[in-house]
C-alpha cells in the first residue's frame, strides 16, 4: 500500500476542482455565450502529471 503525500493530495484536489463544469449562473449572465470550458479533462483520455 502506498501512502499519498500531502503535496500530491493537494495537487489531485486542485485538479478535481478545476475539472468542474461552468456554473449555471455564468451561462445565464453571458446569455449562453459561455457554455463549456476547453480545459475539461476526462479521466480516461488524459492523465495527470502529479
Curated annotation (Swiss-Prot):
Record-level GO cellular component terms: ribonucleoprotein complex; ribosome
Pfam families: Ribosomal_L39
Database matches in SUPFAM superfamilies: Ribosomal protein L39e (SSF48662)
Keywords noted in UniProt: Ribonucleoprotein, Ribosomal protein
InterPro entries documented for this protein: Ribosomal_eL39 (IPR000077), Ribosomal_eL39_dom_sf (IPR023626)
Gene Ontology terms, MF aspect: structural constituent of ribosome
Top-level taxonomic group: Archaea
Alphabetical list of Gene3D superfamilies matching this protein: Ribosomal protein L39e (1.10.1620.10)
GO biological process: translation
Sequence similarity: Belongs to the eukaryotic ribosomal protein eL39 family.
HAMAP family, A to Z: Ribosomal_eL39
UniProt cross-references to NCBIfam families, sorted A to Z: PRK01242.1
Protein name: Large ribosomal subunit protein eL39
Name of the gene this protein is made from: rpl39e
Amino acid at each position: 500500500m502506498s501512502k499519498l503525500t500531502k503535496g500530491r493530495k493537494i495537487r489531485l484536489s486542485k485538479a478535481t476542482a478545476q475539472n468542474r463544469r461552468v456554473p449555471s449562473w455564468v451561462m445565464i449572465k453571458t446569455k449562453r455565450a459561455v457554455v463549456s470550458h476547453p480545459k475539461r479533462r476526462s479521466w480516461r483520455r488524459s492523465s495527470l502529471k502529479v
